[in-house]
Amino acid sequence: MVDLQEKQCTIVKRNGMFVPFDRNRIFQALEAAFRDTRRIDDHMPLPEDLESSIRSITHQVVKEVVQKITDGQVVTVERIQDMVESQLYVNGLQDVARDYIVYRDDRKAHRKKSWQSLSVVRRCGTVVHFNPMKISAALEKAFRATDKTEGMTPSSVREEINALTQNIVAEIEECCPQQDRRIDIEKIQDIVEQQLMVVGHYAVAKNYILYREARARVRDNREEDGSTEKTIAEEAVEVLSKDGSTYTMTHSQLLAHLARACSRFPETTDAALLTDMAFANFYSGIKESEVVLACIMAARANIEKEPDYAFVAAELLLDVVYKEALGKSKYAEDLEQAHRDHFKRYIAEGDTYRLNAELKHLFDLDALADAMDLSRDLQFSYMGIQNLYDRYFNHHEGCRLETPQIFWMRVAMGLALNEQDKTSWAITFYNLLSTFRYTPATPTLFNSGMRHSQLSSCYLSTVQDNLVNIYKVIADNAMLSKWAGGIGNDWTAIRATGALIKGTNGRSQGVIPFIKVTNDTAVAVNQGGKRKGAVCVYLEVWHLDYEDFLELRKNTGDERRRAHDVNIASWIPDLFFKRLQQKGTWTLFSPDDVPGLHDAYGEEFERLYEEYERKVDTGEIRLFKKVEAEDLWRKMLSMLFETGHPWMTFKDPSNIRSAQDHKGVVRCSNLCTEILLNCSETETAVCNLGSINLVQHIVGDGLDEEKLSETISIAVRMLDNVIDINFYPTKEAKEANFAHRAIGLGVMGFQDALYKLDISYASQEAVEFADYSSELISYYAIQASCLLAKERGTYSSYKGSKWDRGLLPIDTIQLLANYRGEANLQMDTSSRKDWEPIRSLVKEHGMRHCQLMAIAPTATISNIIGVTQSIEPTYKHLFVKSNLSGEFTIPNVYLIEKLKKLGIWDADMLDDLKYFDGSLLEIERIPDHLKHIFLTAFEIEPEWIIECASRRQKWIDMGQSLNLYLAQPDGKKLSNMYLTAWKKGLKTTYYLRSSSATTVEKSFVDINKRGIQPRWMKNKSASAGIIVERAKKAPVCSLEEGCEACQ
């Protein structure tokens, strides 16, 4: 019988994940070892004495494992195998132990045997690295010649070539002894011939043989003439240019081009390698654009080995951008003058290109042109430039019109339109943006300086219980979504299924069918042609349709009652958690039977809710349902884990701590759960977002407070300008934004900042940094708003607000504590700075904005400037990134920098990272202190992430898009995690992510080397060379690659 202590133990698998410890696995491994050594067939029973020995050794190993875990040690699979080995010797079973050791040594030896260590002896005697791409290229040429292919090679042929190449590489590895990893080029070509015939490509094999004979004759003739064989630098292809003409490109010309792109990184990048890789994909008549793409793809493919290739790829793409926009290479001697001329021409002809017609009249274009610094292009990595190219640069008839610096200046000009000294402020804004200190949200980047300057990120609306308003809000969603806004809808007021419709004397079908219409509208109206609309639907947990609402995202059931494209979120009052703690019942109502309940919060909500429950008991309310709070909670957690929805958001802290409690109620959040503003039938709440890049403010071992203060002051001014410049798709949005002037200043690169400071996310130091950085941002953001109020006046609904009553965000924690009680609120309230000067400023000048701070996900803008998203921990240290231009692997540059300093960044380390899915825990060469600093999201206990969020929450006046991570969630862990989030004072949470969401691409990991074949198989299996596909993604954020509505 397994005791409780053993059941609670977890070990670390080879994929880096913690899993429950299972003694049966040890027993089974030992049984297989004994059968193999003693040659006992599987169908034969084990002798009693051997079975007894196996059980005894299993017990001894289990005891040692449990003791080590109890002592706080991390136990890996490899460590358990060491224990098994030791126990076999202790028990006198040397023969089994010996075979066990030999097997393990074989597996280690396989790790060193890889095509990456192979060398090729060329005909001239020189030795070069083996490059499988050369085989692919030769095969492609043979297939193209046989099939008389024109243009691009068909994908079916490429797949066939990939399979052949893999088989050929495996055969080559078998031919090369471990001691001398060299092979003759002729031998390689022989293997190619054989493999072509093995799979039945006789025509291709014939052409390949004839080609080899022809090349041999050419070489013989050269030798007779006394000439030497051409070097690879003399290879050439015919290239088809855009105008239809052709020209010859030689290997050496391409090498010169790539050498310029690599010139900034002579020690870490290899232009010759890129040239070989690119040339291997060329064919006669290749298009110019395909040549460029092949070069970029070659650099991109090497990013996982050397992060500097990301900047090489960026440089190559920049050259494309400059040629497209300016008609000149970025290496042109007169580039700066050409850039200035193009900028002035672009703005002057702006009417043609959808620019704001006023730009050319209101700004000194010469001064702006001179202010742009092209050297700042060098800050971009490949992903940043690719994102800008694919999504953000203005274009006309398929041609990009902007370079990175023109893009930043266009955004800056748009944000300076209402300034007195427009040119001076545009330059100030440009300098902040182009140095990556602050980045506005995606709608602002899309539309600032454009004809339709819809710059706002988030809209929140509430739906009234009548058809006219229902369809008005749906129509408003369409208009808001058209201009790239992300939307949060509150649907709690809609009467439930079965409620009486007095006008027709019929019965309502409830809220679900209307959410279905909302879903289909979001899909139908895309955001400026860039992606489908994005909506989150909120419902309070006492609504009678709430249980059906929970199942909206399920893949089974009646499709008429499913909404697969909208996001859904629960709006949860504190009373529900109190009932949950008391193991009490929870009553579901139809909103038309409980007037005022949705608008109430805190003690007033509890009073009304209990009054309506009494009416149920007396029979005054007939349409209701009583459920156990625990059962409903279990269903909420189950759906959250199964579908990723509904997100958990908390009604009472969102309202009790709201600065605008005098002007209404917060009824829901936005698309990404960070915005908390009042909305009503006459007001659609609006928020404008932007994020500070924390990395740019790290100096030495801390934050540069003066620089951060300056950044915040300018950023708040830009966000304030958005409100006045903005194009408003609806009247309700315009009136709300002008009345309350909400802005959402957030952060990104939190994890990068921790790396720079050598701090682990799973540490008290990280908690303190989250606290201190948030306090500074809150301090200087409030100061900036006060100074703007002095300059421009307070927002119109300022009187009566918490600001006006002398309450800052830190002060409102006590209000929440007064309602909840100390047991249900565990928030730190300490501070480092003297807040009296800020209190005096607020009292003297008031506030320019009703709300100031919110932390958005920043999924796309963080990619542009090359930092980690928002406040997110590192997901993996090696992960596959997808964008409109395809997939590529991205490594953690901070980790690689550390590993390089230790001298342990090499091909084996990269292979280990891939094998262990981007985790470090089981890579023995990496020191423990680095493993602690570089824990990934699923290796960090949720308590650390929640505590960091709680420290931020005490300073910010709205919310934060907070993803939570569990490697292997179960009901108890999930429940504890969300209850902890509630008790720590969080206002909202976002996605729950599980470790099955994604794995690192293993296409280039030899799975036979890793022992994925049956445990005790002595010979290589037929399936050993197959490619491991990435696991199917579990439900996670569909907006992962670019929540363009909120960042």
Curated annotation (Swiss-Prot):
Asked if ATP-binding is a keyword of the record, the answer is: yes
Site (Important for hydrogen atom transfer): residue numbering on this chain: C458, C687
Q: Which UniProt keywords apply?
A: Allosteric enzyme, ATP-binding, Deoxyribonucleotide synthesis, Disulfide bond, Nucleotide-binding, Oxidoreductase, Repeat
Question: What function does this protein fulfil?
Answer: Provides the precursors necessary for DNA synthesis. Catalyzes the biosynthesis of deoxyribonucleotides from the corresponding ribonucleotides.
Sequence positions that bind substrate:
T442, S457, C458, G486, N670, L671, C672, T673, E674, P857, T858, A859, T860, I861
| SUPFAM superfamilies linked | PFL-like glycyl radical enzymes (SSF51998), R1 subunit of ribonucleotide reductase, N-terminal domain (SSF48168)
The protein in question is named Ribonucleoside-diphosphate reductase subunit alpha
| Activity control note | Under complex allosteric control mediated by deoxynucleoside triphosphates and ATP binding. The type of nucleotide bound at the specificity site determines substrate preference. It seems probable that ATP makes the enzyme reduce CDP and UDP, dGTP favors ADP reduction and dTTP favors GDP reduction.
Q: What species was this sequence derived from?
A: Chlamydia trachomatis serovar D (strain ATCC VR-885 / DSM 19411 / UW-3/Cx)
Q: What class of enzyme is it?
A: oxidoreductase
